[in-house]
Amino acid sequence: MLLALDAGNSNITIGAFEGSDLVCQWRLRTVHDQTADEWGILLRNLFSPAGLDIRRVDGIIISSVVPPIDSTLAFMTQRYFHTNAMFVGPHTDIGLEIRYDNPNEVGADRLVNGVAGFYKYGGPCVVVDMGTTINFDCISAAGEYLGGSIAVGIGISINALFSKTARLPKVDFRRPKNVIGTNTVASIQSGLYYGAIGMIDGILERVISQLGPETKAIATGGQAHMIVEGSRYLKTYDEHLTLQGLQMIWERNHPEAPQSE
C-alpha cells in the first residue's frame, strides 16, 4: 500500500493507494510545530476506522510546500512506518521536462498537478488548483512543464476583506443566487464568487490563446467545484488530481511496485 501526502500551507491531504486505486483519503490541518510523534500517532489512528492495515504500507511519497515540517514528516515516516519517504522535487523523475527558469523555485504540488493533468487528460493542458493560493500550471503538448501563474486564494481574500474593514462581516464562500446582492452578505459573496471567476477566466483566456484552442483546463482543490459551475473555461473538476499525480510519480520511480488490475 502506498501512502501519498500533499502538504500544503493550510491542509495536508493524505491518500492510501492499492496500486493505482485510491482507497481512502483524509485531510488534516497543517500544524508547523507538531512533533513527529504527534503526526505518527495521528496518522496511525486514521487507519483502523477505515478498515485498513497500517502494516501494509510499504511506500510513502510526499509533496510539500512547507519546508519547516519536511524533516518532521521524514522522521515520522521512518519511526512509525519504517520506510524512507520519497519527497517530490525539481530533480525527481516526473516524466515532464521542466522549462521553468529556475526549477528549484517550482512548488512540488505544481509539478505533481502538471503530471496528473498531462497523463490523465493529455496536453496541452492547464491545471487550476484552488488552495491557499490559486495556481495555474501549464503543460505543453510535448509534455513540458512551462510554468504558469500564482494568484491570491479565495480564503485569503475573505480574511483580508474581513480584517481590513470595520463593518463587513466574515462570510462563507458560496455561489450567490444573483450577481446583484440585496444585502451585505449576498453582496460580499457575489463579489468574492464572481471576482474569483473573473480572475480565473481572464487568466485562462490568455493561457489558452498562448497554448492553443485545444488546451484542456482542469480544476482541483477546495472550492474548485463551485468555480467550475460558473466558469466559461473550466469544465472538468478532478477532486483527487494531486494525490493521483503523486501515485503516478511513485509508480514511475518504482516500476517494480504491484499494480491494480
From Swiss-Prot:
Belongs to the type III pantothenate kinase family. A monovalent cation. Ammonium or potassium. One of its GO terms (biological process) is coenzyme A biosynthetic process. It comes from Solibacter usitatus (strain Ellin6076). Catalyzes the phosphorylation of pantothenate (Pan), the first step in CoA biosynthesis. The keyword Metal-binding applies. Its EC number is 2.7.1.33. SUPFAM superfamilies: Actin-like ATPase domain. Homodimer. The keyword Metal-binding applies. It catalyses: (R)-pantothenate + ATP = (R)-4'-phosphopantothenate + ADP + H(+). Substrate binds at Y100, G107, A108, D109, R110, T184. It is found in: Cytoplasm. The active site is at D109 (proton acceptor). K(+) binds at D129. Keywords: ATP-binding, Coenzyme A biosynthesis, Cytoplasm, Kinase, Metal-binding, Nucleotide-binding, Potassium, Transferase. Its cofactor is NH4(+); K(+). ATP binds at D6, A7, G8, N9, S10, N11, I12, T13, T132. InterPro entries: ATPase_NBD, Type_III_PanK. GO terms for cellular component: cytoplasm. Pathway: Cofactor biosynthesis; coenzyme A biosynthesis; CoA from (R)-pantothenate: step 1/5. It holds the Pfam family Pan_kinase. GO terms for molecular function: ATP binding; metal ion binding; pantothenate kinase activity. Its main location: cytoplasm. Gene3D superfamilies: 3.30.420.40. This is Type III pantothenate kinase.
